[in-house]
């Protein structure tokens, strides 16, 4: 449980596009009194910290530092964004061997100085690396969280909201499973302010059929690739997603977010990290919710879990 105190310290490991933008989003949110940036590129890390610090007059009081792992000591949350970036045409799972080796050097250092912190993994492939972090850290599963499908779920809400011309915040739904190509859309539980989506579409004379679901799902699944093809990387939306998770933890909100967590017995799925609706609060993941899926969705979720397990089993360096 995050202890209530006058200061809140968040460390961000990795000061690339995602890490630096996450630090910026955290700074704007006002949730932290201290943010520490750590990266192998010392000069860039110092530059990012300087640039952020120069905006201190425009936000709540916050101390932005660059440093090494010792400077992260006593962090409430350690956000891990370090790793090889996803290139054009490269899947998240193809990043695995590069990033496992990076994590084998990062996690022991993080744990050395932060025995009581919550670890929030963002680097891709996030589900696999969350599992790797869980194993390397020795932390309880509640305190090792992956950003999971929080961003994918936001993308799904955006797509539905755009097509139906409604506020995406009024769309209740989840993307579950891998944060990647095998993720699933939970159409069977999707609703618009507690009205089932098929009923809402019928009442409002809107499209909702197999073609609609396929188009929306493909747009969500391929969203990162489309952004990467155009600008080289995704970082704004994931930074906002990470900030949302951090706020839920620090505020002990007990809100439901589809983060990546260790699944132990859900439709026969065990010993793998997957994006699942979870109650997120001061102790991290307080409970994973076993929502009822239809047969097709459950089957796809099992396949998603198998994909991730096979990737772990085939990865080098584990």
Swiss-Prot record:
<feature type="binding site">
    <location>
        <begin position="83"/>
        <end position="84"/>
    </location>
    <ligand>
        <name>NAD(+)</name>
    </ligand>
</feature>
<feature type="binding site">
    <location>
        <position position="18"/>
    </location>
    <ligand>
        <name>NAD(+)</name>
    </ligand>
</feature>
<feature type="active site" description="Proton acceptor">
    <location>
        <position position="179"/>
    </location>
</feature>
<dbReference type="InterPro" id="IPR011304">
    <property type="entry name" value="L-lactate_DH"/>
</dbReference>
<keyword id="KW-0520">NAD</keyword>
<dbReference type="GO" id="GO:0006089">
    <property type="term" value="P:lactate metabolic process"/>
</dbReference>
<keyword id="KW-0560">Oxidoreductase</keyword>
<dbReference type="Pfam" id="PF02866">
    <property type="entry name" value="Ldh_1_C"/>
</dbReference>
<dbReference type="GO" id="GO:0004459">
    <property type="term" value="F:L-lactate dehydrogenase activity"/>
</dbReference>
<feature type="binding site">
    <location>
        <position position="39"/>
    </location>
    <ligand>
        <name>NAD(+)</name>
    </ligand>
</feature>
<feature type="binding site">
    <location>
        <position position="69"/>
    </location>
    <ligand>
        <name>NAD(+)</name>
    </ligand>
</feature>
<feature type="binding site">
    <location>
        <begin position="122"/>
        <end position="124"/>
    </location>
    <ligand>
        <name>NAD(+)</name>
    </ligand>
</feature>
<feature type="binding site">
    <location>
        <position position="44"/>
    </location>
    <ligand>
        <name>NAD(+)</name>
    </ligand>
</feature>
<dbReference type="InterPro" id="IPR015955">
    <property type="entry name" value="Lactate_DH/Glyco_Ohase_4_C"/>
</dbReference>
<feature type="binding site">
    <location>
        <position position="147"/>
    </location>
    <ligand>
        <name>NAD(+)</name>
    </ligand>
</feature>
<dbReference type="InterPro" id="IPR022383">
    <property type="entry name" value="Lactate/malate_DH_C"/>
</dbReference>
<keyword id="KW-0597">Phosphoprotein</keyword>
<protein>
    <recommendedName>
        <fullName>L-lactate dehydrogenase</fullName>
        <ecNumber>1.1.1.27</ecNumber>
    </recommendedName>
</protein>
<dbReference type="InterPro" id="IPR018177">
    <property type="entry name" value="L-lactate_DH_AS"/>
</dbReference>
<dbReference type="InterPro" id="IPR036291">
    <property type="entry name" value="NAD(P)-bd_dom_sf"/>
</dbReference>
<dbReference type="GO" id="GO:0006096">
    <property type="term" value="P:glycolytic process"/>
</dbReference>
<feature type="binding site">
    <location>
        <begin position="152"/>
        <end position="155"/>
    </location>
    <ligand>
        <name>substrate</name>
    </ligand>
</feature>
<feature type="binding site">
    <location>
        <position position="105"/>
    </location>
    <ligand>
        <name>NAD(+)</name>
    </ligand>
</feature>
<keyword id="KW-0963">Cytoplasm</keyword>
<feature type="binding site">
    <location>
        <position position="234"/>
    </location>
    <ligand>
        <name>substrate</name>
    </ligand>
</feature>
<dbReference type="GO" id="GO:0005737">
    <property type="term" value="C:cytoplasm"/>
</dbReference>
<comment type="function">
    <text>Catalyzes the conversion of lactate to pyruvate.</text>
</comment>
<feature type="binding site">
    <location>
        <position position="92"/>
    </location>
    <ligand>
        <name>substrate</name>
    </ligand>
</feature>
<feature type="binding site">
    <location>
        <begin position="124"/>
        <end position="127"/>
    </location>
    <ligand>
        <name>substrate</name>
    </ligand>
</feature>
<dbReference type="InterPro" id="IPR001557">
    <property type="entry name" value="L-lactate/malate_DH"/>
</dbReference>
<comment type="pathway">
    <text>Fermentation; pyruvate fermentation to lactate; (S)-lactate from pyruvate: step 1/1.</text>
</comment>
<feature type="binding site">
    <location>
        <position position="86"/>
    </location>
    <ligand>
        <name>substrate</name>
    </ligand>
</feature>
<dbReference type="InterPro" id="IPR001236">
    <property type="entry name" value="Lactate/malate_DH_N"/>
</dbReference>
<dbReference type="Pfam" id="PF00056">
    <property type="entry name" value="Ldh_1_N"/>
</dbReference>
<feature type="modified residue" description="Phosphotyrosine">
    <location>
        <position position="225"/>
    </location>
</feature>
<comment type="subunit">
    <text>Homotetramer.</text>
</comment>
<comment type="similarity">
    <text>Belongs to the LDH/MDH superfamily. LDH family.</text>
</comment>
């Amino acid at each position: 449980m995050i202890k209530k105190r006058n200061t809140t310290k968040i460390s961000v490991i990795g000061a690339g596009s995602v890490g630096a933008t996450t630090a910026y989003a955290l700074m704007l949110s006002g949730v932290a009194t201290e943010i520490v940036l750590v990266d192998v590129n010392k000069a860039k890390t110092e530059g990012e910290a300087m640039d952020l610090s120069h905006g201190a007059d425009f936000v709540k009081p916050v101390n932005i530092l660059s440093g090494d792992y010792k400077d992260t000591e006593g962090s409430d949350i350690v956000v891990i964004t370090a790793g090889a970036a996803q290139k054009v045409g490269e899947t998240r799972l193809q990043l695995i061997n590069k990033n496992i080796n990076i994590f084998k050097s990062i996690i022991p250092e993080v744990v050395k100085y932060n025995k009581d912190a919550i670890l929030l993994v963002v680097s891709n492939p996030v589900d696999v690396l969350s599992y790797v972090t869980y194993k390397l850290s020795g932390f309880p599963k509640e305190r090792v969280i992956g950003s999971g499908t929080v961003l994918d779920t936001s993308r799904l809400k955006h797509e539905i909201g755009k097509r139906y011309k409604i506020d995406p915040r009024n769309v209740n739904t989840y993307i579950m499973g891998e944060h990647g190509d095998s993720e699933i859309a939970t159409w069977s539980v999707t609703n618009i302010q507690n009205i089932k989506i098929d009923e809402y579409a019928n009442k409002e004379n809107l499209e909702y059929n197999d073609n609609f679901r396929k188009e929306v799902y493909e747009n969500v699944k391929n969203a990162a690739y489309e952004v990467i093809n155009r600008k080289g990387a995704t970082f704004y939306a994931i930074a906002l997603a990470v900030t949302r998770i951090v706020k839920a933890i620090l505020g002990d909100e007990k809100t439901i977010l589809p983060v990546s967590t260790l699944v132990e017995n859900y439709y026969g799925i065990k010993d793998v990290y997957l994006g699942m609706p979870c109650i997120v609060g001061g102790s991290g993941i307080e409970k994973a919710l076993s929502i009822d899926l239809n047969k097709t969705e459950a089957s796809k979720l099992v396949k998603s879990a198998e994909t991730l397990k096979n990737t772990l089993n085939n990865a080098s360096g584990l």
